[in-house]
Amino acid sequence: MILSTVGYHWEEAFGAYDEFRNGGWDVALFTVDGSPPKVDPTSLKRTGPLSWFGFGVSKANSPESPRGRELMAAIEGLRPLSDLDPSAIDALYLPGGHGCLFDVNRSEALHGVIGELHRNGKPLSGVCHATSTYAFVEADGRPIVAGKRFTGFPGFVDTIMSSTGLVQREFLPIPFSNDQALADAGAKLSWRNKLLAALNPRYTRVDWPFVTGMGPKAARGVAREIIRSQRHTYPE
């Protein structure tokens, strides 16, 4: 799991971490340069029923929960991406948050790791703004996402949120559109897909080796698909 040092979304990391740990997996945490990650403060706000839609966080999923404390301890011991051995991991998961658009998504070092994992047929996953990371990786001169069904945080929702003050100022202007980057690389992202993603906070798409989700509430579903994929051979 690669966390942003500019601003990752808490539940997008927590939800997947919780599912992986429940499934008996070890989870290795990294940042691009080994610096401490920074959580987007809006993702830690207690918002009551709104947390069901991915706005803020519930008490059960907070850093103060038992699993939250475990994750916080793991974050204290994270390592730089240069320490990641692609041959030693079973899958890659990327939590989003607007901050990842500034450091994780365009990291050439991470692109190299992804390229090796892709060559070896390992599952590649992510949610929200992190999904466009895969748009910048090529194999044999072609984007690895070309022709693949993807989802992530819709650009039109970003536009609405930015204009209504729902995005932290430090993330503005948003450096690029998550879904536009994917579309430019040839990923399949129809308006129907974008609408479904906007209406269903748990929306996920599977097109191996990729497993992607709309946002915070999709993190658990993405992790479950990855866990299932290791029990069965997924289709080419």
Where are these regions (language model features)?
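Extended, subdomain-level signal for the structured scaffold at the beginning of enzyme domains
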Residues: 1-120, 132-236
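Active-site cofactor/cluster-binding pocket
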Residues: 123
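Short, thiol/selenol-centered motifs that function as redox-active sites or metal-ligating centers
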Residues: 126-131
